[in-house]
């Protein structure tokens, strides 16, 4: 029993029987206080208020002293209050009590119940810490992670600080004294209900007002209040927009039309250009194919240049349609942004929203004029513009080039060797061999200025003719031969016999005559390609035809013997 109680009751008993008083005092000493434990909340009575201290009796040997500052509302003597027992007996023998901790214990209990039920708790964001914010839950401090502040990043968090607002308790650890709360969960739940309501009303064709929430390369996300929609780059304007940031700003208010609603995936596609009439509906009439007009260069691309047809509408001039003579040239080299150019309409594709234009077709094709003045067979003189490994390029005027392939330089000599004898700037004579206006190519030749020396040979030694030739050289790859002492010929190793073991050049001797069949003539060199094998096969087939089939009683050897005898 506390000393104060003794002081209050024992003197009053002094008038009583001394023995009774002594027994009563002992009884008070033996009052059971075992149910009172440290770190628990108990009820106590205020027995005295002294200066800044409130003395509370909780039924222990000693009273406890609590600073007035721990009480929000000051109690009076005799009031019963809940207190937290820190220590039953401190260093000075007094019981250490705390009203503040008792309140927190009570609040913790309430918060635990609310957390288990999923109920929201009111609190105030009052400070910033690493990774988030601190929240006052009526006396208990909780942690609000940065990721749980809002459904989207907040640039200025001061707008939500020092305001009483609801939070959801995510986790509690009484041992560590940690509470984690979420503001975002409240917003999401509220947003989810509003979102479901909004989605139930969404219909294609609806016009809504929203706020630009995010801008990407492919479009912008529009906040419609409780749900987001995607405004694709191609649905911002009927004209060309390279990037959404060219016409939209973050947090900008915009009017949009619902152009598609995917109910299954809850996706909303939005459009701004659909709020205006489609200019393409009248474009075919306004810009008919073949119409020649002028416009300003607005932008460049790897594949061409864009020209403004009218406000909000552009057409494309492909690289191949800029110049007649420089196919797929870089438009940046000849044109500048803002430059006024003349063009002609090639095609209007209303489905793909494309207008194809041409600059070069506003002028006469210089190659067409060249072809008219220099038909195939014409002999011209032109300066050498460039020399490559495969031929010579000559200047034809008006930035046109003609090409002499190395194979068209000489009938007899190798063209690649002759290229070294020509110099850039030299004027040479050549003949027009072919003109391809579509491909913008002019083929020329030098050797065609003189007759083909092998034409006579080609006429005399036609394919299939049987000739006799003199062996002039034996090589691993075959035999070099001479026909009529003037025309060179060659028999490949594989053409020496129809028997593989006889296809050996070393079996033949120089200056010996050999009979073979003309297989082909190399036009560039005039060399005749011959075949002994083809000749023998032809002879065999002829013999079979004249003397009968090998299925008869006469054997093949007899047939061939008879054929050879007749030849004699």
Swiss-Prot record:
Keywords: Repeat, Ribonucleoprotein, Ribosomal protein, RNA-binding. GO terms for biological process: translation. Residues 39-100, 118-184, 205-273, 290-360, 377-447, 464-533 form the S1 motif domain. One of its GO terms (molecular function) is structural constituent of ribosome. One of its GO terms (cellular component) is cytosolic small ribosomal subunit. The keyword Ribonucleoprotein applies. It comes from the Bacteria. SUPFAM superfamilies: Nucleic acid-binding proteins. Binds mRNA; thus facilitating recognition of the initiation point. It is needed to translate mRNA with a short Shine-Dalgarno (SD) purine-rich sequence. NCBIfam families: PRK06299.1-2, rpsA. Belongs to the bacterial ribosomal protein bS1 family. This is Small ribosomal subunit protein bS1.
């Amino acid at each position: 029993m506390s000393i104060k109680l003794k002081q209050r009751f024992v003197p009053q008993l002094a008038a009583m029987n001394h023995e009774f008083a002594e027994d009563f005092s002992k009884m008070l000493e033996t009052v059971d206080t075992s149910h009172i434990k440290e770190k628990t909340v108990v009820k106590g009575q205020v027995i005295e208020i002294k200066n800044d201290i409130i003395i509370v009796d909780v039924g222990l040997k000693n009273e406890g002293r609590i600073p007035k500052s721990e009480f929000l509302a000051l109690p009076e003597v005799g009031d019963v209050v809940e207190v937290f027992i820190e220590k039953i007996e401190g260093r000075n023998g007094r019981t250490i009590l705390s009203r503040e901790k008792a309140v927190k214990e009570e609040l913790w209990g309430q918060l635990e119940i609310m957390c288990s039920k999923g109920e929201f708790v009111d609190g105030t964001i009052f400070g910033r810490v690493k990774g988030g914010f601190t929240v006052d839950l009526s006396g208990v401090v909780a942690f609000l992670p940065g990721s749980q502040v809002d459904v989207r990043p907040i640039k200025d968090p001061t707008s939500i600080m020092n305001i009483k607002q609801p939070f959801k308790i995510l986790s509690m650890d009484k041992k560590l004294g940690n509470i984690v709360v979420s503001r975002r969960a409240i917003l999401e739940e509220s947003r989810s209900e509003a979102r479901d309501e909004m989605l139930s009303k969404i219909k294609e064709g609806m016009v809504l007002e929203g706020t630009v929430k995010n801008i990407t390369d492919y479009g912008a996300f529009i906040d419609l209040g409780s749900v987001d929609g995607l405004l694709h780059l191609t649905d911002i304007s009927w004209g060309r927009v390279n990037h959404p940031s060219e016409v939209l700003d973050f947090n900008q208010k915009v009017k949009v039309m619902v152009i598609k609603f995917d109910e299954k995936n809850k996706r909303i596609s939005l459009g701004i250009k659909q709020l205006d009439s489609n200019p393409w509906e009248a474009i075919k009439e306004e810009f008919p194919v073949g119409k020649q007009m002028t416009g300003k260069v607005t932008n460049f691309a790897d594949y061409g240049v864009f020209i403004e047809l009218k406000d909000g509408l552009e057409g494309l001039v492909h690289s191949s349609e800029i110049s007649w003579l420089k196919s797929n040239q870089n438009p940046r080299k000849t044109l500048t942004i803002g430059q006024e150019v003349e063009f002609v309409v090639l095609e209007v594709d209303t489905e793909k929203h494309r207008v194809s234009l041409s600059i070069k077709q506003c002028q006469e094709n210089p190659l067409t004029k060249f072809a008219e003045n220099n038909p195939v067979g014409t002999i011209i003189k032109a300066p050498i513009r460039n020399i490559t490994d495969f031929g010579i390029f000559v200047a034809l005027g008006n930035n046109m080039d003609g090409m002499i392939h190395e194979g068209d330089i000489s009938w007899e000599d190798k063209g690649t060797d002759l290229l070294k004898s020509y110099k850039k700037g030299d004027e040479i004579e050549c003949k027009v061999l072919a003109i391809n206006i579509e491909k913008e190519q002019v083929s020329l030749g030098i050797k065609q200025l003189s007759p083909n020396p092998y034409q006579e040979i080609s006429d005399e030694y036609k394919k299939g003719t049987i000739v006799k030739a003199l062996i002039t050289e034996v090589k691993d790859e075959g035999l070099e031969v001479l026909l009529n002492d003037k025309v060179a010929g060659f028999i490949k190793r594989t053409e020496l016999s129809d028997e593989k073991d006889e296809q050996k050049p070393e079996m033949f001797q120089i200056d010996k005559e050999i009979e073979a069949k003309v297989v082909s003539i190399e036009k560039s060199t005039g060399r005749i390609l011959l075949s002994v094998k083809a000749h023998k096969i032809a002879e065999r087939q002829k013999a079979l035809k004249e003397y009968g089939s090998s299925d008869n009683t006469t054997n093949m050897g007899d047939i061939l013997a008879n054929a050879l005898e007749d030849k004699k």
